[in-house]
């Protein structure tokens, strides 16, 4: 039996991305009319057959959610995000299947059965996942979107917080209270969200003419995305902007164990505007 032609095969023939092929076949924006014509011509030449539309029940639709294991532990943010998606789906009479992607599955790009067998009409990636895994999933041709992250190398619809502006405003608020030495907590290269929050922090400091010191940027997680103990600098800043509330809480506990009062000695805030510690500081 001849092997089924995939979007990835068409993409390889034309030297373009699988996402572009998907858009061309679906008649979506993002590819030129000339390229769309080439995609359709090559698809016909190669005998491409679009997979049958998936339905879990007559008249119903389904979506799959993929989330990396490192994000779906005790992290209240992603638990709440998942519940919000479930609520919206239920209101639209859409069923939801979820797969927690374990580290080994992410590394080996092992796709869940509901995706391989096209048991879903669409896919949501919730929280950052490796580019290789994402690219492999895209090749299935199932429509997808990204939730709480983006990837510069993959054209996709995404839903995001305005991380840069939120962090900028929080850093600016700290500056307005008279603090001039401000650090940042977050492994900047770990996720697009942390990177954008760091950029907002840097922008605020640059505009105020304040120092940006490498020793005041604390790493909060390892290459696997797992939290690590903080290494406090020898010379402490007056405040820290943390990339999320969980990290802020962990930092407060670390500061207390090391004899610092929060916020009297060191103020701690997350990038979404929440202050942490025994008391709110005036601002």
Roles of regions detected by a PLM:
Residues 1-2, 60-172, 230-239, 246:
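Alpha-helical recognition/docking segments in bacterial nutrient-uptake
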Residues 1-58:
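N-terminal helix-turn-helix DNA-binding module of bacterial transcription factors
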Residues 13, 23, 56-73, 173, ...:
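Short beta-strand segments enriched in small/hydrophobic residues
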Residues 89-101, 198, 202-226:
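Short beta-strand elements in bilobed, periplasmic/extracellular small-molecule ligand-binding domains
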Residues 168-210:
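An alpha-beta-alpha
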Residues 180-181, 212-216, 262-268:
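Short acidic capping loops at alpha-helix termini that bridge into adjacent secondary structure
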Residues 228-283:
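Flexible loop/turn connectors
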């Amino acid at each position: 039996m001849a092997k089924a032609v995939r979007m990835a095969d068409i993409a390889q023939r034309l030297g373009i991305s699988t996402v572009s092929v998907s858009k061309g076949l679906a008649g979506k924006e993002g590819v030129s009319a000339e390229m769309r014509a080439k995609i359709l011509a090559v698809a016909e030449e190669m005998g491409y057959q679009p997979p049958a539309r998936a339905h879990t029940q007559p008249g119903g639709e389904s979506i799959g959610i993929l989330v990396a294991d490192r994000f779906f532990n005790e992290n209240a943010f992603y638990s709440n995000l998942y519940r919000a998606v479930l609520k919206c789906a239920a209101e639209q009479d859409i069923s939801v299947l979820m797969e927690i992607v374990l580290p080994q599955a992410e590394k080996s790009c092992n796709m869940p059965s509901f995706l391989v067998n096209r048991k879903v009409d669409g896919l949501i990636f919730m929280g950052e996942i490796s580019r290789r895994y994402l690219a492999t999933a895209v090749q299935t041709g199932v429509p997808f979107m990204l939730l709480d992250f983006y990837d510069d190398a993959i054209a996709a619809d995404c839903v995001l917080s305005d991380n840069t502006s939120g962090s900028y405003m929080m850093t600016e608020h700290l500056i307005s209270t008279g603090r001039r030495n401000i650090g940042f907590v977050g492994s900047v290269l770990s996720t697009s969200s942390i990177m954008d929050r760091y950029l907002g922090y840097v922008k605020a400091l640059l505009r105020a003419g304040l120092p940006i010191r490498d020793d005041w940027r604390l790493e909060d997680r390892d290459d696997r995305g797992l939290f690590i103990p903080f290494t406090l600098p020898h010379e402490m800043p007056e405040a820290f902007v943390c990339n999320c509330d969980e990290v802020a809480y962990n930092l407060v506990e670390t500061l207390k164990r090391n004899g610092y009062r929060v916020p009297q000695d060191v103020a701690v805030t997350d990038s979404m505007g929440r202050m942490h510690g025994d008391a709110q500081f005036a601002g």
